[in-house]
Amino acid sequence: MVDKSNKVALVLGATGISGWALAKNALSYPSRSTFQRVIGLMHRPRTVEETGLPNDPRLELYSGVDLQGDLNHVVVKLKEKIPRIEEVTHVYYLAYMTLQTCSGDMRQFRDANVAMTYTAVHACDRLCPNMEFFVLQTGTNAYGVACFDYLRQTQLQVPLRESNPRVPRPWSDTLFYYAQADLIKEANKGKAWKWCEVRPDQIVGHTPAQVSVPYVAPMALYLALYRYINGPGARVQFPGTVRNYHHTYTDVRPDTMARAELYLSLVKSDESHGEAFNIADTDTPGPWSAKWPSICRYFGLEASETIDDEWTDIDGWWYANQTAYERMCAEYGLQKQVMSPTAWSLMKMGHTLIDQNRELCLDKIRGLGFTEDHPVGSSYFQVFEDFERMKIIPPKVVLASPRCRDVLHQC
């Protein structure tokens, strides 16, 4: 266990799905006394209340620093914005430039993320003389999971292990994880601080400030509205392909991922230095065929046995039924959500294009003593319960009753 000390965490990207969980968990894991300060850097200004993070005097949130800027300018802005930044001992790099922000240009997407990482690690190296550890979070594209041209040429060897060779060129030309890890390794030469890379696959979670970003939000809203319109016991079809329905993978909740990153950087900093680690809720592969029926039952629905071999256009159905959605929100006092095309696009991609088995091997992180484990698919129900409390979907007791359809038919 980590002793009480003067450790200070800096979370870059503190309101994203990963950074939010890291900032929250750093206040209590491995213990409440581990960090005397938890500093979150955000792209946009938000209050603690708006972020949904705990109201803890150790938590500090700052914005107004664009990591896409010139390194020298970023150094000046960080020093200006964050009091006593020199106290920082642990940096968690969870910032990310989206493909949509780069107008779908894959090369620009790669270059922007590499440049941000370069700026972040070198700025922290300059400003934080007490820095002990730097965590880089990447993902399973380190194995080519979302490199679709590559997947047409090869079959992934599962379970995916950290020792797997890199995706070869030209398929890896637009992947930025390798360049991120390489530049941190280079920056670390001759320095006292340590670093590691953490690789999750599908992250099942949300943040109060960005509900619509992860695909679990459009899924939950679609199923809630489908139940409202069609009534209890209605059969609902899996929206993706047959291959996607049956392929195996290992997802992770943000809290598990955050605690793993804290564990590696605090408890096993020597052993994890310079290494990459897979992380998931469990090493038991969980295909959609093991999750979809129980997810449907949560919403008072039954999973249809019919599965098409293409996207079922649930986004089109959603937009066509906005009148019913507004009625459902009014009836149950829900907070109306606006689903962006990006949210639906991410869901469509995950349910149609990724159609190979891709489960992760967790032997490496388990070997260092991080053994947190959760049942297959349980992360979805945790998110659904959060959505109920946030009044994004009707309560489960309502979904389990026949009243939704009766209300609609009376209107």
UniProtKB/Swiss-Prot annotation:
Keywords: NADP, Oxidoreductase. NADP(+) binds at D105, Q137, Y249, R253. It holds the Pfam family PRISE. Its EC number is 1.1.1.-. The keyword Metal-binding does not apply. The keyword Acyltransferase does not apply. Pathway: Secondary metabolite biosynthesis; terpenoid biosynthesis. One of its GO terms (biological process) is terpenoid biosynthetic process. The active site is at Y249 (proton donor), Y263 (proton donor). It is an enzyme of class 1 (oxidoreductase). In A.calidoustus, the austinoid gene cluster lies on a contiguous DNA region, while clusters from E.nidulans and P.brasilianum are split in their respective genomes. Genetic rearrangements provoked variability among the clusters and E.nidulans produces the least number of austionoid derivatives with the end products austinol and dehydroaustinol, while P.brasilianum can produce until acetoxydehydroaustin, and A.calidoustus produces the highest number of identified derivatives. Short chain dehydrogenase; part of the gene cluster that mediates the biosynthesis of calidodehydroaustin, a fungal meroterpenoid. The first step of the pathway is the synthesis of 3,5-dimethylorsellinic acid by the polyketide synthase ausA. 3,5-dimethylorsellinic acid is then prenylated by the polyprenyl transferase ausN. Further epoxidation by the FAD-dependent monooxygenase ausM and cyclization by the probable terpene cyclase ausL lead to the formation of protoaustinoid A. Belongs to the short-chain dehydrogenases/reductases (SDR) family. This is Short chain dehydrogenase ausT. It comes from Aspergillus calidoustus.
